[in-house]
């Protein structure tokens, strides 16, 4: 499955626009991560536990979007975007979305 943040591919022509596809996941903070994060705020620097959680969440949302595009018979997703939003205190939604298309050379 090809993906791009652009609205087209240089070497392909969009044959058919299938429509919006998306994937999301909602994650909550971990009490263990919170304790470590609290300590790190004292000394400063990156909080690798949260960085890892953010990366895993983005990957899961991306994977779910790709699965939806494949189920619809798409060859690619154009206009790929990521978003985050707070859902409840201590939790966040990670969203990946774009337009599913079929391609021709």
From Swiss-Prot:
Which InterPro entries does the entry mention? Answer: UPF0145_dom_sf, UPF0145_YbjQ-like
The highest taxon in the source lineage is Archaea
Q: Which family does it belong to?
A: Belongs to the UPF0145 family.
State the protein's name.
Answer: UPF0145 protein Mevan_1624
